[in-house]
Amino acid sequence: MASGRITLAARRAATFVAAIAVAGLVLYAVAQVAGRFGVYDLTRDAGFTDHSLPPPDPRSEQELEALRRFPPGATKLQPLIDATATGGVLTLPPGLYAAPGLIDRKMRIEAQTGAIVDGGGVGSIITVNADDVSITGLTLRNSGERHETTDAAIRLRGRHGSFKDNVIENCLFGFELKQADRNIIRRNRIASRELPEALRGDAIRVWYSTGNVIEDNDIERTRDVVVWYAKDNRIAGNRIRDSRYGVHLMYAHGNAIEKNHFLSNTVGVFLMYANDTKIVDNVITYSQGPSGIGVGFKESSNTLVAHNDIFANARGVFMDASPYDPEGFNRFEMNRIAYNGVAIAFHSDWEGNAFERNAFIGNHRAVTVAGARSAKRNRWDGNYWDDYEGFDRDSDGKGDTPYESWSWADRLWMDVPDAQFFRAAPSLEAIDFVERLGAFHEPQLILRDSAPLFSAPQGAGVRRGEKSS
């Protein structure tokens, strides 16, 4: 009898644990769907969590103050802020100022050349918890280096702010926006701390924020410009180099990435679970190394990629399960994709992408598909392929026969990662030549463009001097 009661209790406990696990999986699935389809405001509107405040630092203000190290003669910034009236202007003459600074009301800080705010190597330098705040012409340096408290030059929680012509040096994070809408971040120079790439902070981190304009900034040696759960932001005219991700979108919809120059980053632009994005008029170059990608997609839909110059990357475009929406489409139009190791690399034989009027020039391989599959389920129409071997006898600008790309012995390095070491090596090229000559097995058709252009389309690539929409 006792053993029967124990068995019954064990069964009840197992049932309870299983029910908790199922409930957790259901809640996780709901959260994923909410993020995927842009349902942003569940917790904000219900008031469950106030994300507008920075995460608390476990150290007291007295402990932080004791840790800060400032240059001799630095003037404390906070008393100057406190003495400025609501809506007033704080003019900072040349000199050294000691952080931190907390702005909790509408005001402007206008710095003269040589005005420097030093963070003392601890915490964030300026925190903005108010709307309609402007900071112009200031140099901010030496934030803390703790990721768990997001030590930044400027932490922004307000709306309708303006942050222009500032210099950010040796700060872990540059700008950190959280529930901060419709701000302008323009013409700032941003560099992170001298740390390994993965340990640096983000130049600009946008979380849960809408309608911000990030333009004409000069960013180098940071980690990412990352946009999470944020929509309708415009990232334009920036120069981003020597970082990890130039721009990284996650669960972020309706954003525009226009007229930027991405140089020598690990990845130029990467979309993860991001829909309705515009990637237009960008120069994306020298994303090299094993992870090098010019533009990457992971389960992202309804993206326009147009008039970009995608040059000299390990992979010009990388596609993974995109578009994810069964009714969605990604469009690639009028891009110059040139001198890459692989122009377009598909992780699988996914469908729903259209490539029209692009110029493929000087790539070692135009298109690859992992897993011995093909890209035929995507639309290829009217592109220029520099290895096209047909004629244009009627002079209509299009080839008389379709362009076809086949895989022969090069299937080896497409499917076996270790074999990529031999890509373009004489040994593998010789095998490929013999394979084509003897046709010992049936090659695989990778793609067919039924109306290939006979010359590169006029106007492909970045439109110089034109304003993006």
Tell what function each PLM region has:
Residues 62-99:
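Acidic Gly/Asp/Thr-rich repetitive segments characteristic of extracellular carbohydrate-active
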Residues 41, 47-53, 58, 290, ...:
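Functionally critical loop-and-helix segments that line ligand-binding/catalytic clefts
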Residues 91, 102, 110, 118, ...:
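Extracellular beta-strand solenoid repeats
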Residues 82-85, 96-110, 117-161, 172-180, ...:
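Extracellular beta-strand-rich solenoid/capping regions of secreted or surface-exposed proteins
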